[in-house]
Regions:
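Flexible, low-complexity linker and terminal segments
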Residues: 96, 101-223
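Short, surface-exposed, polar/charged, turn-prone segments marking secondary-structure boundaries
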Residues: 26-27, 48-52, 74-78, 111-114, ...
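Short acidic (Asp/Glu) and glycine-rich catalytic loops that position anionic groups and cofactors
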Residues: 15, 74-81, 171-179
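Thiamine diphosphate
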Residues: 1-74, 83-104, 221
Length: 223
């Protein structure tokens, strides 16, 4: 399928209770930006692997570059939280992939894994990695009959239900919506929902299961 369909299929997987990741590069990601923005407004987890290559345009499609950080950081119309992980080694790539799914599920936000062509073309044997044999249980709830997908929450994180798991309807919509998921243009609801979504920026910074770390020299500009 094309990139537009791919990211929407991924969002459908998360909506149904699964775990999905899409992988692309350059212009392919440009086609995914509307789907990325959709993930932002419906507060859906999503994992996106963006393999950087030299642009603009087709650029140098078989060479390496690290020029897409701003693209990942600001892609998608409108303002919504996202996280970006950038592995520098194959070992870190495995770890980042695991953590990306945990972080996306915990924050109900898109999470990027940002790599470059050099890393993707690399290959060597690795020692056994301490990765779990099975993924953690998804953070979904059994819905009550009066379930509201976007219920107000102090940290911006509403309980995430999925269709068929409980008694409630799980409404999602790319238009602005109220707590129950119904389309609205009321200014006070718009302000409240924007503030709710942006609260998750603090959540992304402070999630205890994803401690801050720094790999590489303490001062990369001089070392």
């Amino acid at each position: 399928e094309d990139e537009i369909a791919a990211i929407n299929m991924g969002l459908g997987g998360w909506y149904a209770g699964g775990r999905a990741m899409v992988s692309t590069s350059g212009g392919g990601f440009a086609l995914m930006e509307e789907g990325l923005s959709l993930a932002g407004v419906i507060e859906s987890p999503m994992v996106i692997h963006l393999a950087q290559r030299p642009g603009p345009g087709t650029g140098l499609p078989t060479r390496t570059e690290q020029g897409d950080l701003d693209l990942a950081l600001y892609a998608g119309h409108g303002e919504f939280p996202r996280a970006i992980l950038a592995p520098g080694t194959l070992e870190e790539a495995f770890r980042c992939a695991e953590q990306a799914f945990i972080l996306a599920d915990a924050s109900q936000c898109p999470v990027f894994i940002l790599t470059d062509q050099y890393l993707l073309d690399s290959g060597h044997d690795l020692a056994a990695l301490p990765l779990p044999a099975t993924p953690p249980e998804p953070r979904i709830v059994a819905t009550e009959a009066d379930y509201q997908r976007y219920a107000a929450a102090e940290n911006g994180l509403s309980p995430r239900g999925i269709p068929g798991h409980g008694q409630g309807l799980v409404r999602v919509d790319s238009d602005e919506h109220d707590e129950a998921g119904f389309i609205t243009e009321r200014a006070e609801v718009r302000i409240a929902m924007m503030n709710k979504r942006l609260k998750k920026l603090a959540l992304l910074r402070d999630l205890p299961e994803f401690p801050h770390c720094w790999s590489g020299p303490a001062n990369p500009r001089s070392e």
